[in-house]
Amino acid sequence: MYSVSPTQTELFHLRLLLLTVKGATSFNDLRTVNGEVYQSFSAACLALGLIENDDEWRRAMNEAAEWMMPRQLRRLFVRILLHCQPLHPEELWENFKVAMSEDYSRHFGILQGQQKAYAQIGTMLIAEGKSFTDFPQMEQLIGNYEEENYITLEDAMEIGTKQYKQLNNKQKVIVDLILNRLDNINHNSNCFYIDGPGGSGTAATLLPAGKTVHKTFGLPVSLFADSSSSIKIQSKEAQYLRETDIFIWDEAPMAPRYALEIIGRTLRDIMNNNLPFGGKIIILGGDFRQLLPIKLHGTRSEIVNLSIKFSYVWKYFTSFSLSKNMRVLPEENEFAKFLLNMGDGVLNDSNDNVHLPDNCIASINANIAEDIYDELIRNKEFNKMAKCAILSARNKDVDEINIQVVELLDTLEERIYTSIDSTENCSDNDEINEVILPEYLNSLSPSSLPPYKLRLKPNCIVMLIRNLSINEGLCNGTRLIIIELADHLLKCKILTGDKVGDIVFLNRITLYCENVYPFTFKRRQFPIKLAFAMTINKSQGQTFDKIGIDLRKDVFNHGQLYVGFSR
């Protein structure tokens, strides 16, 4: 098919329709969407969601107004502000302010109800690190934000006391020491590392009100030795860090040492002293048997050197080790010992291979997708299915297995969602936009983005690939099961974290991929991937009732086999 420049508006959109619409026999057919004939090819493309404008968000809010309670609708509006860059957010508020404020309006009247709903939207933005000042088109509020329902001190004390009673003796020794240090600050040694082999602690995804390290300390996405925090000394973020007594960082061994060093410098600057980490109590948790930091095309020695153990601040840490596996039954102790030996390298032969027990190995003709999921799907045991996973070392193998599992589900309610793909930062060579065809962009599938075509069915297991709202439990790596499919929204149930069981609604957002192509690649799509199967790296920190591990191709990183077997 001939290429057409985007400057030839109608011809460009005609070409886009010819690539998308199946079975059309006339121009009228191409301009018909859901029974309505549009006046132009560009209008038909808009109706099909093939090109960008704010109508996507208006339609999503329209669908949401039928499904959601007002508070959920406000959360969706905040998510659109944060992740979708609407051109006219003030119009979106005006169009849906009645629906977003119904709960308040019943008690306070329409005008005051809308004011309170708007104030709570401001509070939600602040909780995500933004405010109305980041959206100058919106009416600005000075103070008077609606308070969120935070946990009380009494409730926190009750929860803490209950959890303390559940600790084993080794855990109590560590907790008592740290609590004592909190009451009697010793400026020389306030840093602790707790080594926890798989199953010896609590999964970090189960801990409430957590935040990512990058967001808490203002770390850049790409970390280097000379990177610095974005937090300003006089900012509210700095004041939050100043008032925090203890920082607990789980899965710390996965982070590059630069992250730990930046945090140390940032806390010293904020506390205005030269003490390690500004004198704060720092608790790192993790397991060096698991995955180490990722360095693209890095050698073995470069990856090891990137570990926090090789940082100049590691000397300030006192190490403890937990050994009792809290997840296994007494009859599984032998397997727990096998796991520990695998992680410690005891099982490796002279070629660094591990010989697995025969009872762990499937027959050569086995189909891993059917073995794990087929019976559960046929019996409609979707809750059990949600507690299973297939793990593989490579994204390509994961994608193939996910396609196989989706085939096992009922096809009657299947929907295919296509993305809108474009480029940015092409100003150095304006002609690039003339050369790049839409179908070329559609063919790109970087691992950091969802696919161009998302083929979904009810009861599909999916995983978020972006942090949408930590307060809602919508973090990168959160698994969900799809309940219902609409044109612009997905109704899902959360399967992991402290928000397990919550019903949430996902909309398309704008995602970016940088430093992979000669341009910034932009894709508007639901921020999810199928997750019947996932990479071993993505599974770290999660727990399943049943797993299958695809080892048709060898693992290639330190800790991958150990992580896979300890899920």
Segments predicted by a language model, with ranges:
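Long, low-complexity, charged/polar intrinsically disordered accessory regions
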Residues: 1-137
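RecA-like helicase/translocase P-loop NTPase motor core
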Residues: 1-2, 7-10, 24-52, 130-567
